[in-house]
Amino acid sequence: MCDTLVATPDYTKSRTMILAKNSDREPNEAQSVVRYPRTRQKQKGLKATFIQIPQVKETYEVILSKPFQMWGAEMGVNEHGVAIGNEAVFTKITPPKKNDGLTGMDMLRLALERSKSATAALECITELLAEFGQDACGGYENKDMFYFNSYIIADAKEAWGLETVDRHWVAEKVKGF
């Protein structure tokens, strides 16, 4: 399993927010570190990993660490200092396995491209979850790697833990570590 951690300013010597994440993807799956600049979008839609969704008029600059073949990302930060890491969540609820939803990594990238704060990113992910769901294979060679997602979302002032299953979610503001 991947791990993401956050320490809020009250718990760090430097009095700054710290978010850290590792990746445990498949051995033959390379990670790409990429930067996408702020862009005024001309197209009305975008193709995420598996599905087409509406595009917003402007996307914020992002730096992402992502599996090379995926549209979305495991972790990243945007020009407003919003940082997000995501994890696979395996539950007793089985995804339909139809590839007709977003990946958790798609939602992470979309939230960074569209949000000026951690709270706005939380709202973006939960709205995407409600509208498009998360039924999409997250594996590279393993084409049966369907899972739900959890996230740690932070900016300089606040951090959130977000757990999801299917289209359901629960969030809690992080205070401390």
Positions of PLM-derived features:
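Second-shell loop/turn segments in exported
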Residues: P96, M107-R114
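A contiguous strand-loop segment
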Residues: M1-G104, C124-F177
